[in-house]
Regions:
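Short, solvent-exposed turn/loop segments enriched in Gly/Ser/Thr/Pro and often Arg
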Residues: 26-33, 143, 268-274
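An active-site-proximal structural segment forming one wall of the substrate-binding cleft
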Residues: 1-28, 37-77, 124-126
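Anion (oxyanion) recognition and catalysis
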Residues: 8, 15, 198, 259-260
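A structure-centric feature marking long, well-folded core domains of fungal metabolic enzymes
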Residues: 4, 28-31, 63, 67, ...
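Aromatic-rich peripheral "rim/lid" segments of glycoside hydrolase catalytic domains that contact
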Residues: 234-305
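Extracellular glycoside hydrolase catalytic/binding regions
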Residues: 72, 84-253
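Aromatic- and acidic-residue-enriched segments that line the glycan-binding/catalytic groove
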Residues: 29-48, 91-98, 221-226, 287, ...
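A cross-family glycoside hydrolase active-site/sugar-binding cleft signature
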Residues: 22-26, 77-79, 138-140, 163-165, ...
Length: 305
């Protein structure tokens, strides 16, 4: 497992300072989503190759064996963002994330929910061999949050958490109006309602979210695309600080209220390495950085009475 020594260090730090770790297997050979975060843009063939599926299962076993009884372990997430048909089409993945190696990308396509169900069940069995029941096995919803109501209902499945990733850029791609009212209504009607509904079946965490949105960027980002996708961003500030603050505080409050219907949430990410001041096309992308959001007072740091 690459860089496993660094993960060893992370556990030592976590246990020293009273933190807990959710290990997330973020990529799979031949890609599980075709996104840039899947390791190979435009390539999504992992689930079609039984040998690679088995390899991922053995990696999960090794992780569970190495860290399953560590005090600092909260749980293991089986796989990050395995894409299914709806988001594959919504994002038009082959064009949004064009493959460098066209031959390698040939035959790429979304994973099926039927495959993910079988894979998750096998992964659970492999992980639980080495991990106590009080540690969590986390499964991603494949971007279809309400599709799992009848899944893992048997008594053998203990402490399974359902992870959903909800970004306003995805709401925009789905047709959400790029206004404060548009965002807050979408969050309430979709994120909040669906999380509350699914909490009846699993503990639900929003494993990725942020304040990023096109309105605060001052331009339509086409669902969160950037200069890396060939979409030019704003070249100069189009909003005042007060206007930005109003937008970000409104979407922060709406989203935090939605996540309260579930069992937890993780902001993505704590730190953004992109220089939004000196690099062209990145105005408005500070909101991916939680530290900057707190510094700029976009993110509430105290609960309201």
């Amino acid at each position: 497992i690459g860089c496993v020594e660094e993960l060893d260090k992370a556990f030592n730090w976590a246990e020293k300072y009273g933190l807990q770790i959710l290990i997330d297997l973020h990529t799979a050979p031949e890609g599980q989503n075709g996104f840039d975060n899947g390791g190979i843009c435009g390539v999504c063939k992992w689930s079609k190759n039984p040998e690679e599926v088995e390899f991922v299962l053995t990696v999960l076993e090794r992780l569970a064996k190495r860290y399953g009884k560590r005090k600092g372990l909260w749980g293991i997430e089986v796989l990050n963002e395995p894409i299914t048909e709806s988001v594959w089409e919504l994002f038009d993945v082959p064009n949004r994330y064009p493959a460098v190696d066209k031959e390698m990308a040939a035959g790429s396509g979304p994973n099926t929910l039927a495959f993910l169900r079988i894979f998750y069940q096998e992964a659970y069995d492999r992980i639980r061999k080495y991990m106590p029941k009080e540690k969590y096995v986390v499964i991603h919803d494949g971007f279809v949050l309400t599709a799992w109501k009848d899944f893992m209902r048997e008594e053998k499945y203990v402490d399974v958490v359902l992870d959903t990733h909800q970004y306003l850029m995805m709401a925009e791609a789905a047709g959400c109006e790029q206004t404060i009212e548009g965002y807050t209504c979408f969050v309430k009607e979709h994120y909040e309602k669906e999380i509350e509904e699914m909490e009846k079946y699993f503990p639900v965490i929003c494993g990725e979210w942020c304040l990023f949105n096109s309105l605060a960027c001052g331009c339509d980002t086409k669902g969160g695309q950037s200069v890396l996708n060939g979409v030019d961003g704003a070249k100069e500030e189009r909003l005042t600080l007060d206007e930005k603050n109003e937008i970000y505080r409104a979407v922060a409050d709406a989203q935090l209220q939605a996540w309260q219907k579930g069992s937890g949430y993780f902001y993505w990410s704590y730190k953004l390495l992109t220089d939004t001041v000196n690099e062209n096309g990145w105005l408005g992308w500070d909101s991916w950085d939680l530290g900057r959001c707190v510094d700029f007072k976009w993110f509430p740091t105290q609960k309201k009475n």
